[in-house]
Amino acid sequence: MPASGKRRYASALRSRSAEATKTRILDAAKELFTNQGIDGVTIARIAETAGVAAATVYALFKSKEGILRALMRASLFGQKFQDALAKLEGVTDPVGAIALTAHVARAIYESESAELGLIRGASAFSPALRNMEQEFETTRFEMQEQRVAHLFAKAKQREGLRLDEARRILWMYTSRDIYRMLVHEGGWTPDRYQQWLSEILVRALVNDEAGREWASSLD
């Protein structure tokens, strides 16, 4: 094997090893945070459970807040979310994209269900973690902008609705609290939540004619 090929191979091995180490640390942290509470867990304890040196944890995540940030990102924007987003990117009809946003929301919250209490508890105790949660909400708000703008560009929005209002309505209906109240506390299945949300988003944001066209396309 040429020297350049050996270097690439060695680099790939190091990358896989680093990812495996990160996964072990995050798995250990999630288990400890869930069982012992966030405040009661130290970096040293996480390192011991993961089978690595504390210096390795600091090198990869900098702090306990960094670990929590990584856990939240994996929970909110993990593989289910990526799969839903890929499906959404193939939709050219703006009404269909608005309706399919329900699938994206479900993917986010269904993935994070195991960590829902952990994340909400963390946000309740630490201003830094509340700020972190707000960052994720801001990201979610920004990611929805193109879908709403496309709806307006095709003049399929509900009459009298402004773009900024439509963005806020979409953001509100797809919030974690709505999912929590309906699924976790209300006993709805994720399927029922997704169907309801899809229909409510179209009714709230789309004009009647475009809404009827979308509904007929489902028959």
Spans of model-derived segments:
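N-terminal intrinsically disordered/low-complexity leader segments
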Residues: 1-20, 213-219
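Short loop-to-helix capping motifs
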Residues: 63, 112, 125-126, 176
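Hydrophobic alpha-helical connector segments
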Residues: 70, 83-110, 167
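Helix-turn-helix
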Residues: 24, 28, 32-66, 70
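Amphipathic alpha-helical packing segments from all-alpha helical-bundle domains
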Residues: 103, 107-120, 128-155, 164-168, ...
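Short, basic, alpha-helical segments at the C-terminal edge of helix-turn-helix-like DNA-binding modules
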Residues: 43, 72-79
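Hydrophobic/aromatic-rich alpha-helical bundle segments in the mid-to-C-terminal region
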Residues: 152-200, 208-219
